[in-house]
Amino acid sequence: MGSADDRRFEVLRAIVADFVATKEPIGSKTLVERHNLGVSSATVRNDMAVLEAEGYITQPHTSSGRVPTEKGYREFVDRLDDVKPLSSAERRAILKFLETGVDLDDVLRRAVRLLAQLTRQVAIVQYPTLSTSSVRHLEVVALTPARLLLVVITDTGRVDQRIVELGDAIDEHELATLRDLLGQALEGKRLSAASVAVSDLATHLSGSPGMSHRLADAVGRSATVLVETLVEHTEERLLLGGTANLTRNTADFGGSLRSVLEALEEQVVVLRLLAAQQEAGKVTVRIGHETEAEQMAGTSVVTTAYGSSGKVYGGMGVVGPTRMDYPGTIANVAAVALYIGEVLGTR
């Protein structure tokens, strides 16, 4: 790339920075005064004319200034050499705030609230997807001799509790045997494999001559409940925070704010964007029509995945106007995702 192209990119970068900060169209005189571009106002005007002709900036209404287009923002983001990481104090504060969450729900609620505050955008966090989860532990508790509580804990920290009504009461020895059998069948397996294993266990034991009818019945009833829990309870869940941040920037959406809010409420578009995040640590920025959703055409969506030990739990990110502090948003999304994974990975 020649020096003229490099210089024009510096002009574009200055226009993006000033427009994000001020919301005002940027003129050549303002750029020369605010930035050490090393060239005259006339040269900057010429560079702006080229940038406009190539579709990187545009002139809104009758203003003398220019604003970035989607293409301009994309060029700016693609050429971010290095996103400045958060300070050690900021990182410690994020980790401490998330670590005090008492369970998965609390950690994710804290994360979405924190990310919305840090970015001043709408924050979105996807609950760990069940399809990628494994059973960490199964606990079986006798509420009464004929009524059991099954507690399934996944490696992502998700906890599901189910009640099993038995046909016949079982004693302490049979309860311990039931706990061992179910635990051996489930623990360490992906949820889909675990559901098959527990179903096979029930089938195998139903005709076992060494198994009491009461215990075989308890295994069968427990297996039915567990299969429903592991396989059928697969709805995707999203947490949203900071929706009010969008209403503070209504002008940025050009009358499309209602459709953005409707898309967030319906969740389908957001879940599709998050589902594309398969690599923790990689941040994806979709600008305007890159979201491939007409309702979101006036937005930018910054997403990543969170997880632990190389395993992705789910996606997260922010939704805001295209007039966004991209370097700061990318840094905050990456940091919060990293520490969600750390916190959940140690539980």
UniProtKB/Swiss-Prot annotation:
GO terms for biological process: negative regulation of DNA-templated transcription. InterPro entries: GAF-like_dom_sf, HrcA, HrcA_C, WH-like_DNA-bd_sf, WH_DNA-bd_sf, WHTH_transcript_rep_HrcA_IDD. It comes from the Bacteria. It holds the Pfam family HrcA. GO terms for molecular function: DNA binding. Coiled coil: none annotated. Keywords: Repressor, Stress response, Transcription, Transcription regulation. Negative regulator of class I heat shock genes (grpE-dnaK-dnaJ and groELS operons). Prevents heat-shock induction of these operons. Belongs to the HrcA family. HAMAP family: HrcA (MF_00081). This is Heat-inducible transcription repressor HrcA. It comes from Mycobacterium sp. (strain KMS).
